[in-house]
Swiss-Prot record:
Tissue expression notes: Highly expressed in testis. Also expressed in brain, heart, liver, skeletal muscle and kidney. In brain, preferentially expressed in the telencephalon ventricular and subventricular zones, albeit at low levels. In adult testis, expressed in cells above seminiferous tubules, but only weakly in spermatogonia.
Gene: Dcun1d1
One Pfam family here: Cullin_binding
Molecular function GO terms recorded: cullin family protein binding
Protein name: DCN1-like protein 1
UniProt keyword Nucleus present: yes
PANTHER family: DCN1-LIKE PROTEIN 1, RP42 RELATED
DCUN1 domain span: 60-248
Keyword Ubl conjugation: yes
Species of the source: Mus musculus
Record function comment: Part of an E3 ubiquitin ligase complex for neddylation. Promotes neddylation of cullin components of E3 cullin-RING ubiquitin ligase complexes. Acts by binding to cullin-RBX1 complexes in the cytoplasm and promoting their nuclear translocation, enhancing recruitment of E2-NEDD8 (UBE2M-NEDD8) thioester to the complex, and optimizing the orientation of proteins in the complex to allow efficient transfer of NEDD8 from the E2 to the cullin substrates. Involved in the release of inhibitory effets of CAND1 on cullin-RING ligase E3 complex assembly and activity.
Modifications made to the protein after synthesis: Mono- and poly-ubiquitinated by ARIH2 and ARIH1. Monoubiquitination by ARIH2 is mediated by an interaction between autoubiquitinated ARIH2 and the UBA-like domain. The monoubiquitinated form preferentially interacts with non-neddylated cullins and modulates cullin RING ligase (CRL) complex composition and activity.
Site-annotated residues for Essential for interaction with UBE2M: C115
Length: 259
């Protein structure tokens, strides 16, 4: 790192902290992305295999990974892990199947639907993460959670959740399922989450379209505490327009009682 400028050294240190990668990987990724830290971290998380210089895949024991898959595979269909296998997988990881950590693993595996992994999803996902054991996967979980601190990666994770959660063949996401997943992924990120859920249960009572799901993330990150910055003429879904109309008097009422 001696040949680098001080500003570049700072970026290398930040990159290493953020991605939990080595100095060699940090220098390689930053130099390929014009030393733009945000671009480099985003590209690293999207395609880690292009930048990781340590031979993660080379040190992977394929036979061990196959044996691990065999532990979880569906007895009736050897090409997938069914609900019982998922439960065993979660037990081995000491994780609640309904936890956000399990959802993050499903995202990293690019799983198509909840409560199962195809053999390809499991094998490719574990390989990409450089894991051939439950212990190695456990050690990766904090890094995956760290990855979600980058807004672009969280958005990818959030949008993945809609397709993962809905029933195959359905366009929308059932309301109860949508609320359950919103409580999981937007907890601590959307100040009006409880009010949003109340509004949906009282006034909507229908499935949630993909467009509404995706735009709620944008809404949650821009809306002011009193909703005064909401643009009714903007390209927001009608459901969000209706929510703002429902919520504003309640927010104003809460403020007047606390003053």
């Amino acid at each position: 790192m001696n040949k680098l400028k001080s500003s570049q050294k700072d970026k290398v240190r930040q990159f290493m902290i953020f991605t939990q990668s080595s100095e060699k990987t940090a220098v390689s990724c930053l130099s390929q992305n014009d030393w733009k830290l945000d671009v480099a971290t985003d590209n690293f998380f999207q395609n880690p295999e292009l930048y990781i210089r340590e031979s993660v895949k080379g040190s992977l024991d394929r036979k061990k990974l196959e044996q691990l898959y065999t532990r979880y595979k569906d007895p009736q269909d050897e090409n997938k892990i069914g609900i019982d296998g998922i439960q065993q997988f979660c037990d081995d990881l000491a994780l609640d199947p309904a936890s956000i950590s399990v959802l993050i693993i499903a995202w990293k595996f690019r799983a198509a639907t909840q409560c199962e992994f195809s053999k390809q999803e499991f094998m490719d996902g574990m390989t990409e993460l450089g894991c051939d054991s439950i212990e190695k996967l456990k050690a990766q979980i904090p890094k995956m959670e760290q990855e979600l601190k980058e807004p672009g990666r969280f958005k990818d994770f959030y949008q993945f959740t809609f397709n993962f959660a809905k029933n195959p063949g359905q366009k929308g996401l059932d309301l109860e399922m949508a609320i359950a997943y919103w409580n999981l992924v937007l907890n601590g990120r959307f100040k009006f989450l409880d009010l949003w859920n109340k509004f949906l249960l009282e006034h909507h009572k229908r499935s949630i379209p993909k467009d509404t799901w995706n735009l709620l993330l944008d809404f949650s990150s821009m809306i002011a505490d009193d909703m005064s910055n909401y643009d009714e003429e903007g390209a927001w879904p009608v459901l969000i327009d209706d929510f703002v109309e429902f919520a504003r008097p309640q927010i104003a009422g809460t403020k007047s009682t606390t003053v």
